Every structure is written in structure tokens, then in C-alpha cells.
């Protein structure tokens, strides 16, 4: 089996992606009124980075970005949700493997595929895994954390569905379409 190294491009993408994730997570959020639950723009950006650079970059961007955001905001990380940010980044990257954004195409079919995938991924991560980890790690009350999880899942589905789709479409549109250049 051939060993695959992580490219410099991927490492740089993780670093820049994590930094942007922190900035968006700290300064571009809309409070919902429910404790520790906001409309997050950072996950739409995470979907873009993950779709472009793949599951590993998504995993690391989500983990590092969320951990730094928590440390700079609260003084410590809420590890159950940090882990889920990594998982969701990996899932966005896995979904992105089928999109082929570098071809310059992000069709209606691709948008539907992306959005069905991100809806399923967000429900699994935020409505199921994060609250369960909150109970196992922090002994949090189930009704509180599952309510937070469901609200977060719905808000992330909306944010990624709108902002993420726009970002992916804009990125694909900036790529040179295959076969668009002809020799004269």
C-alpha cells in the first residue's frame, strides 16, 4: 500500500481555514436566545474548505478552529462539540469528494446532493453525537443538551444550506471549466 503524505497546500488550508473559522465563530454569529446556541457562519465556511481540500482538511480545520475559538472565548474547550466540529468537517469533505468543484461545475443536482448530505451530517453530529458526548463527558442533563443539539442542527442546516451553497457555487464558478479553452 502506498503511503500518502499530507501536502503543504493542505496544511496551509488547515491553518488558514482554522483561523477564519475562529474569526467567524467569534465575531460573525447571531445569538438565538437559547444558551450557548447561535446561528453560526463558520460551518458554511468549513463546508467550503472541506469540499475543496477533502475530509482530512475538514476534520483538522473543524477540530483546531473550534478548540481555539472555545479557548479564546471561554478559557477552555467544550470537547464534545469540538470533536463534532471535526466530524462535521470530515463529513463535509467526504460529501465534497463527489462534487468535483475544481471542474468549474456545481449543478442543481450537485447542490441537491450537497444539501441532502449536509442535512444528514448535521443531524447526526449536532442532534445525536454532541448531546450524547455532553452527557457522557460532562454529565449534562439530557433534556437540555438534546434541545441544544436539535436547535444547533437546524440552525447549521439553514446556515450551511444557504451560505455554504452560495460559497460552493461561487468557488466552482471561479474555476476554469474543463474543455473551455480551445487551440486556435
UniProtKB/Swiss-Prot annotation:
It comes from the Bacteria. InterPro entries: ECF_substrate-spec-like (IPR009825), UPF0397 (IPR022914). It is a multi-pass membrane protein. The chain crosses the membrane at residues 11-31, 44-64, 77-97, 111-131, 148-168. It is found in: Cell membrane. Its main location: membrane. Keywords: Cell membrane, Membrane, Transmembrane, Transmembrane helix. Gene3D superfamilies: 1.10.1760.20. GO terms for cellular component: plasma membrane. Belongs to the UPF0397 family. HAMAP family: UPF0397. This is UPF0397 protein SAS2570. It comes from Staphylococcus aureus (strain MSSA476).
